[in-house]
Amino acid sequence: MKRICSIYKSPRKNEMYLYVLKAEGLERVPEALLPFFGTPVHAFDLVLSPERKLAREDIVKVLDNLENQGYHLQMPPAEDEYIEHLPEELLRRNDPV
């Protein structure tokens, strides 16, 4: 089953995205979610199918959420996934002696 999806980014939280069916728009998104998410900013439209791979989301879960609840919320990655931790000697390299 192929679905045309609109993806919106959050102006409040970096790397948080809201997937909705393009034909329905934001009508099934709960009002309680919008203060947390912020005013959705349209990022792009995408054709989704079970064969398609997504970078950080399970396509089957996304399609299921779109069918059953009318939206899918992609949360930002956990901090450990995108922050590089530097070795202690590099952190102290510019400290005064």
From Swiss-Prot:
It holds the Pfam family YcgL. InterPro entries: YcgL-like_sf, YcgL_dom. Residues 3-87 form the YcgL domain. It comes from the Bacteria. This is YcgL domain-containing protein PputW619_3899. It comes from Pseudomonas putida (strain W619).
